[in-house]
Amino acid sequence: MANKKIRIRLKAYEHRTLDTAAGKIVENATRTGATVAGPVPLSTERSLYTIIRATHKYKDSREQFEMRTHKRLIDIINPTQKTVDALMKLDLPSGVNVEIKL
């Protein structure tokens, strides 16, 4: 291929589904003959929301909710056409966001 590297960035709320998706990508890429670097765990983005429990008063009574976004980075170096075809046909679990840069 003309491009020397494919960078895949994965995001998910659950780290187990993220790790299974990363494992499938690495397995398919190595099976087709490409060199793989990763999966590299990136920093986890944490969103914290504080909400007042009561509707009108009692501001001291609050509840906190948290949402974590886990991220992984995979580099596929010197991909072949078989590698690209295998990645296009790959079925990943739902809930995993995939960003691909060539």
Swiss-Prot record:
Role according to the record: Involved in the binding of tRNA to the ribosomes.
Protein name: Small ribosomal subunit protein uS10
Any single GO BP term: translation
InterPro entries associated with the record: Ribosomal_uS10 (IPR001848), Ribosomal_uS10_dom (IPR027486), Ribosomal_uS10_dom_sf (IPR036838)
Listed SUPFAM superfamilies: Ribosomal protein S10
Highest rank taxon of the organism: Bacteria
Gene transcribed to yield this protein: rpsJ
GO molecular-function terms, A-Z: structural constituent of ribosome; tRNA binding
